[in-house]
A protein has these predicted regions:
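Conserved HGGG/HGGXW glycine-rich cap/lid loop of the alpha/beta-hydrolase fold
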Residues: 50-98
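Conserved alpha/beta-hydrolase "nucleophile elbow" surrounding the catalytic nucleophile
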Residues: 68, 127, 131-136
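Active-site loop/oxyanion-hole signature of alpha/beta-hydrolase fold enzymes
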Residues: 90-130, 285
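Flexible "cap/lid" loop of the alpha/beta hydrolase fold
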Residues: 137-144, 151-179
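Conserved alpha/beta-hydrolase catalytic His-Asp/Glu region
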Residues: 164-169, 177-236
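Conserved loop-alpha-helix segment in the C-terminal half of the alpha/beta-hydrolase fold
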Residues: 237-271, 277
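Catalytic active-site module of serine/aspartate enzymes centered on a nucleophile-bearing elbow/loop
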Residues: 263-298
Length: 298
């Protein structure tokens, strides 16, 4: 990559050195990936998108979309179980802390165009789509535009089922502005359930690198409208944690049930916003059962 290209692709990092530091951390986490994987790139109109592919080729294909400020390696706590039963594609979302090229999109349409290109590039007629937090917002936004490439939709702790609490926004803003170890650890504790296990030291080290090396995170999406909820596909699984920090999970649960009774909604005890880590085994089992339920599209 030329210096010009490096500067172009480093736009959402604090510096070229920060980008290099983050990619080194990415490689260290990937070295712990517990299953065989293929690292590949697919072409999009915004630059190449990086994808980690794991799991048997004959299994139901599923694309994973990570949370804001993360990358494909943040699924490391789930990949062993998922890749045992599914063909998993974990993509680095554009404009975030991974290997995907291109600047952070400025609009919902641009994000959806990018995701459309990724789905085309993977080359499967249809895939299951699973998003966590910001990735759940992106998955739902894409399905509002088209469902022709998606067989099933799983949403883990969507950030916009209700308006975000002011206290959460304030804590997140402080941690982004002053990403000291104390601040980032406090924020991590807030988004996790008090019953969740402590992240291993290497995972916290990677989290600190990601917070310190980026120019902020993707902008929080606005609250899902009643119409947005009503048009969620019939084959949708939505999982929330009882200790959700962004909003009242009971209120969100009731809202989805009232407006989208066709959606399967689960409320997990012992899980916060970081639901895929806090209750990894339960989330993994639910995802495998959901995406394998009626067979798959080859």
């Amino acid at each position: 990559m030329s210096l010009f290209e490096a500067r172009l692709h480093a736009g959402h990092f604090r510096s070229l050195e920060a980008r290099s530091t983050l990619l080194d951390s990415y490689a260290r986490v990937l070295a712990r990936w517990p299953v065989p994987y293929e690292s590949r790139y697919v072409e999009t109109r915004y630059g190449r998108a990086h994808v980690l592919a794991s799991g048997p080729a004959y299994a139901p294909p599923v694309l994973l979309l990570h949370g804001g400020g993360g990358n494909a390696t943040t699924w490391i706590h789930n990949i062993e179980r998922l890749a045992g039963s599914l063909q998993v594609y974990a993509v680095d979302i554009i404009g975030d802390a991974g290997r995907t090229e291109g600047r952070r999109p400025a609009s919902e349409d641009a994000y959806c165009n990018w995701l459309e290109d990724v789905l085309i590039g993977i080359g499967r007629p249809k895939l299951g789509l699973c998003g966590s937090s910001f990735g759940a917002w992106l998955a739902a936004a894409y399905l509002r535009q088209t469902s022709r490439r998606v067989s099933r939709l799983a949403l883990l702790a969507p950030p916009n089922l209700e308006s975000m609490r002011v206290s959460f926004m304030a804590r997140a803003g402080l941690a982004l502005t002053f990403p000291s170890e104390r601040m980032v650890r406090a924020f991590q504790a807030m988004v996790s359930s008090p019953l969740a296990p402590e992240p291993p030291p290497w995972a916290m080290d990677d989290l600190l690198v990601r917070w310190r090396c980026q120019r902020g995170h993707p902008r929080p999406p606005g609250r899902m409208s009643d119409a947005d909820l009503r048009v969620l596909p019939k084959q949708t699984l939505l999982m929330l944690g009882e200790d959700e920090a962004l909003y009242d999970p009971l209120r969100a649960f009731a809202r989805v049930q009232a407006l989208a009774p066709h959606v399967r909604v689960e409320l997990l005890p012992g899980a916060g916003h970081a639901i895929a880590y806090d209750q990894a085994a339960k989330v993994d089992d639910a995802l495998v059962e959901f995406f394998r339920r009626d067979g798959w599209t080859l």
